[in-house]
Amino acid sequence: MAKLTKRMRVIREKVDATKQYDINEAISLLKELATAKFVESVDVAVNLGIDARKSDQNVRGATVLPHGTGRSVRVAVFTQGANAEAAKAAGAELVGMEDLAEQIKKGEMNFDVVIASPDAMRVVGQLGQVLGPRGLMPNPKVGTVTPNVAEAVKNAKAGQVRYRNDKNGIIHTTIGKVDFDADKLKENLEALLVALKKAKPSQAKGVYIKKVSISTTMGAGVAVDQAGLSASAN
């Protein structure tokens, strides 16, 4: 049996894997146990009551967290004309059409989010094999294919998170950094849960949000008691 590291021993002693913690207690635990030499992200895993094998029950979308994610996001936009000027004014680092596609084909991918206006998808479509595996392919379901590219850029910069359930029906995303105030992490989590509820497939039966766990980049998951969250989120 592998020997537990000192860090993992401390986590096991502090975190009761069978308990659901009040959100404030859960955040305090994460802050106490975050001892990495960098500012860890706070990640969330939400177990949904869906059948992930059925396409009509899959959950996918995006929402802007009220306090952002703490990450600096570089945005590339495929568009032209007045939209190109609007995208630049909104803060996009890279804006173009065929010229931007050529950069990407050469492996120049210094960006975190790709946005496209509908008329640019003929160009973006050639990049599916490059952008797709990295989760960067623009998609109207998450607001990254849109005629209003300026708004999409602002959302990305403001701390928009994208979510999509995995094959087990679990959503994994981030809600901030461990050095955020506890109230900000709580409000970000509540905003995410509200967005997930709005995205509930009509075919999903029974309990929809079954379990919510939060963790830091290097830490263990802490289950959250949903009763301690705002009424709109639980």
From Swiss-Prot:
Origin: domain of life: Bacteria
InterPro entries documented for this protein: Ribosom_uL1_bac-type, Ribosomal_uL1, Ribosomal_uL1-like, Ribosomal_uL1/biogenesis, Ribosomal_uL1_3-a/b-sand, Ribosomal_uL1_CS
GO CC aspect terms: cytosolic large ribosomal subunit
Entry-linked Pfam families: Ribosomal_L1
Keywords for this protein: Repressor, Ribonucleoprotein, Ribosomal protein, RNA-binding, rRNA-binding, Translation regulation, tRNA-binding
GO BP terms in the entry: regulation of translation; translation
Family recorded in the similarity comment: Belongs to the universal ribosomal protein uL1 family.
PANTHER family linked to this entry: 54S RIBOSOMAL PROTEIN L1, MITOCHONDRIAL (PTHR36427), LARGE RIBOSOMAL SUBUNIT PROTEIN UL1M (PTHR36427:SF3)
HAMAP family: Ribosomal_uL1_B
Name the record gives this protein: Large ribosomal subunit protein uL1
Record gene name: rplA
